[in-house]
UniProtKB/Swiss-Prot annotation:
Spans through the membrane: 439-459
Protein name listed in UniProt: Acyl-CoA-binding domain-containing protein 5
Gene Ontology MF annotations: fatty-acyl-CoA binding
Originating species: Xenopus laevis (African clawed frog)
Biased composition (Basic and acidic residues): 312-322, 335-347
Residues in coiled coil: 382-411
UniProt region (Disordered), positions on chain: 119-204, 219-240, 304-376
Family: Belongs to the ATG37 family.
Gene3D superfamilies: 1.20.80.10
Length: 467
């Protein structure tokens, strides 16, 4: 005979068998509210609407069950069965897998709703998000391993418009500054004295009136851009045409190298800005270090221009003196004493990751220039060695103290054990033959006589009262 039960009734019976097979002390313990729902739906599916009287106050559990059942009203049995199965679907994932649960899953079938991606039609959301991350612009800065993409509707349009306006303003400012600097250079060339011509020399890749633009992503400057443009260039003082030509050629070559290196650095950083190919914390630390380096360069360039206007430039010869042939063989290093001291202090404050950069910059031809940075490194190594030796001595002292404390505690424990043994031996009398103490034996012998005497006194008083 074929099974003629409807599908919802078969599912309902399988769900009821699962609930009835739950152990009382099992890993899954449904709440009271959940059990009330199952009870009310079960009663409604098997007996129909509630027609019984409400239990008395002495049965609070029965009253709660009656209220839950009565709240369903005139719900049909089929709807109650379907609601029972729907409630079971909500908790079936948290229940342990048993034979009853497997039977229920086979009867219910797949009850998950598959939602397709409407935008792409195929491919999951994870792959689309991964593709958006990989194809995002390099302007999305990676912080704590999360890329902040700039493709978010109206906000991205506003940001692009603001960026275009900012670029236009920067270009106009740069054009004005270049025109102003060209006019100043012409005025300086027309003057008879050539001592103040050092103002037009490009120091650290920046002119006197230039400014530093700090972007959102500070990139590390190449070593070619950090070196001095006027280093190791012998310029005769009496020939301004040769001097300006040599300086302009060196400036042009250095600017080309600097732009190429900066483009390469930006290309590399743009490829490694995503959260997949780099460590966000290391990238964030490098960005902060490069940001501080740009600020220091800007401050130092201002100091250079002020000192160069005063004429306090230092020659490349020994002890700052000119060679024997007057102005010939004079080397413009483009550094003042104040600048060199400030630069050394800034390099010493840089983190350990900038050691290679400072080492490359320190290869100039000065006797008192950047090569003096190797001294503090040696002193730092010596200080580290001294600190390690002192730390080792302190550890040895601590170990010795711990050993002495262990020896003292062991000796104290042994002495206490010996004292307790001696006291127990002293308490026991030497010639006592019994295993119990004398006091206990005396009490065991005397107490019957005491009780007999008390009973005798009590009986005498009672007789006196009767007479």
């Amino acid at each position: 005979m074929a099974d003629t039960k409807p599908l919802h009734q078969t599912r309902f019976e399988a769900a009821v068998s699962v609930i009835q097979s739950l152990p009382k002390n099992g890993s899954f313990q449904p709440s009271n509210e959940m059990m009330l729902k199952f009870y009310s739906f079960y009663k409604q599916a098997t007996l129909g609407p509630c027609n019984t009287a409400r239990p008395g106050f002495w049965d609070p559990v029965g009253r709660y069950k009656w209220d839950a059942w009565n709240s369903l009203g005139d719900m049909s049995k089929e709807d109650a069965m379907i609601a029972y199965v729907d409630e079971m679907k909500k908790i079936i994932e948290t229940m342990p897998v048993t034979d009853k649960v497997e039977e229920l899953l086979q009867v219910i079938g797949p009850f998950y709703e598959i939602v397709e991606d409407k935008k792409h039609g195929r491919g999951s959301g994870v792959t689309s998000e991964l593709g958006s991350v990989l194809t995002s612009t390099p302007n999305g800065k990676a912080v704590n391993g999360k890329a902040e993409s700039s493709d978010s509707g109206a906000e991205s349009d506003e940001e692009q418009a603001a960026a275009k306006e900012f670029k236009k303003e920067d270009e106009e400012d740069e054009e004005d500054e270049t025109e102003h600097s060209e006019e100043e250079e012409k005025e300086v060339e027309q003057q008879p004295g050539h001592e103040t011509s050092a103002e037009s020399i490009v120091l650290n890749g920046l002119t006197k009136n230039s400014r530093v633009l700090i972007t959102e992503e500070p990139t590390p400057l190449p070593t070619k851009c950090l070196s001095e443009p006027g280093d190791n260039v012998a310029i005769p003082e009496g020939e301004p045409d040769i001097q300006s030509a040599v300086i302009n050629d060196s400036e042009a070559d250095r600017e080309e190298d600097c732009t190429e290196d900066m483009a390469a650095v930006q290309h590399l950083t743009s490829d490694s800005d995503s959260e997949i190919f780099c460590d966000s914390m290391e990238q964030f630390g490098q960005d902060e270090a490069d940001h501080s380096l740009l600020l220091q360069d800007a401050m130092l360039n201002g100091d250079i221009t002020e000192n160069s206007a005063g004429g306090e430039l230092k020659d490349g010869g020994e002890d700052g003196k000119q060679p024997g042939h007057g102005a010939q063989g004079k080397t413009w290093n483009g550094k003042s004493e104040h600048f060199s001291s400030r630069r050394e202090r800034s390099l010493r404050m840089q983190p350990g990751g900038e050691g290679s950069r400072s080492g490359q910059i320190g290869s100039s031809g000065d006797g008192d220039g950047w090569g003096s940075d190797r001294g503090p490194i040696g002193n730092l190594n010596e200080q580290i060695a001294v600190v390690l030796m002192r730390l080792q001595e302190d550890m040895q002292n601590v170990l010795q103290r711990l050993h002495s404390l262990e020896v003292q505690t062991a000796s104290q424990a042994q002495s206490l054990l010996r004292e307790s043994n001696t006291q127990s031996v002293e308490k026991k009398p030497s010639g006592w033959p019994f295993g119990i103490s004398p006091g206990t034996l005396a009490l065991a012998v005397v107490w019957p006589f005491v009780v007999h005497w008390l009973m005798h006194v009590f009986l005498q008083k009672r007789r006196r009262k009767q007479t």
